[in-house]
């Protein structure tokens, strides 16, 4: 499976996680549907985002306003950050696509004082209790440090942000590569 992806064909023992792929994807019906509707998909692309969010909301039985359809992570991050108001707390080092979308005066940064940049939910709660923000953004596991907060820690952080009326944004793009 892994030999089909990445650019490390000279190093077959190396696994390349640069591309987000799903080896368990059920291809049986979706490929057939795409083939059947290919002429429509090509001639009528792109569908209105309203149509896409409505279809997704019906599929997952959630409110339509909870769905933001997009063409990849970069577009979704851009839309998300443009809609945020107030200040945002980030943890650095981090994936800079998020904070780079805002002026510096709106971004408040936590940097772990530990040599390996490790931190946990208690470190974040302690810091952001003294540096109030409107939104807390957590990438978990973090890119590039690889720091990971367990599900129990995430729940504690989510409860704390709810209690403090802080919007909590959790990006778990690479959570499939973690344990716990």
Residue spans for each PLM region:
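N-terminal "arm"/small-domain region of PLP-dependent enzymes with the aminotransferase-like
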Residues: 1-44, 131-132
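Residue-level marker for buried hydrophobic side chains located in beta-strands
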Residues: 17, 168-169
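Conserved core of the PLP fold type I
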Residues: 22, 41-162, 169, 174-180
């Amino acid at each position: 499976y892994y030999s089909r992806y990445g650019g490390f064909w000279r190093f077959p023992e190396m696994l390349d996680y640069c591309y987000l792929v799903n080896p368990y994807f059920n291809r049986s019906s979706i490929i057939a549907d795409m083939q059947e509707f290919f002429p429509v998909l090509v001639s009528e692309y792109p569908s209105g985002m309203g149509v896409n969010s409505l279809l997704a909301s019906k599929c997952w039985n959630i409110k339509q306003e909870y769905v933001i359809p997009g063409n990849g992570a970069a577009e979704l991050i851009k839309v998300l950050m443009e809609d945020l108001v107030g200040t945002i707390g980030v943890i650095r080092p981090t994936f800079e696509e998020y904070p780079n979308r805002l002026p510096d005066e709106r971004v408040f940064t936590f940097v772990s004082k530990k040599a390996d940049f490790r931190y946990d939910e208690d470190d974040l709660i302690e810091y952001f209790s003294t540096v109030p923000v409107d939104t807390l953004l957590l990438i978990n596991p973090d890119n590039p440090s690889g720091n990971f907060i367990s599900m129990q820690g995430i729940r504690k952080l989510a409860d704390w942000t709810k209690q403090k009326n802080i919007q909590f944004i959790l990006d778990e793009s690479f959570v499939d590569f973690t344990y716990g």
